[in-house]
């Protein structure tokens, strides 16, 4: 749920917490002197995004930075890794950068994105499943977006689909039988 400004990202990784309510991020920037935390709005506008536990790491170890405003940080130009945490809104995680980068998102067991009726992935993603998580990777992309779901939502979809099909059969079968009887007529 971020959009970066003023930084060229090389790699970005996001780890969604169990339960899907928060995430932690690690973003590499090269020859950058600032970084902004933003959501992309429906028209591409920048909407400030609240993050916490922000830290900057580089050749200086745990480097210092200044806040320009509550959503933009400045630091000495260089290559860094920015670590932070944020909240996931409505099982939806998105991000965009000023230049192409490689992004990976790790979902914990119990969260999934592979059912197109419940989940969503932006184009160019590769999904792999391993023992401890579900990994989604985009290579050389300027933006990513995903919507994940829980097993409960999958069961609700199955129940709704089953009820819908039963209702369809209860309406359609008598209609077809009546039509067949009328077709034979005296």
At which residue positions do the language-model features occur?
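Lumenal/extracellular ectodomains and adaptor appendage modules
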Residues: 3-186
């Amino acid at each position: 749920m971020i959009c970066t400004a003023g930084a060229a990202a090389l790699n970005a990784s996001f780890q969604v917490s169990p339960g899907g309510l928060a995430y932690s991020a690690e973003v590499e920037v090269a020859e950058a002197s600032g970084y902004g935390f933003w959501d992309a709005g429906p028209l591409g506008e920048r909407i400030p995004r609240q993050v916490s536990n922000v830290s900057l790491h580089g050749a200086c170890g745990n480097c210092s930075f200044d806040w320009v405003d509550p959503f933009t940080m400045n630091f000495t130009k260089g290559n860094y890794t920015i670590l932070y945490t944020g909240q996931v809104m409505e099982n939806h995680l998105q991000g965009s950068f000023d230049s192409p980068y490689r992004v990976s998102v790790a979902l914990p067991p119990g969260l999934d994105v592979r059912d197109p009726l419940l989940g969503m992935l932006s184009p160019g993603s590769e999904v792999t499943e391993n023992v401890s998580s579900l990994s989604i990777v985009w290579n050389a992309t300027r933006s990513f977006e995903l919507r994940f779901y829980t097993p409960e939502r999958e069961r609700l979809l199955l129940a709704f689909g089953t009820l819908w099909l039963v209702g369809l059969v209860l309406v359609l079968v008598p209609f077809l039988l009546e039509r067949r009887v009328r077709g034979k007529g005296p």
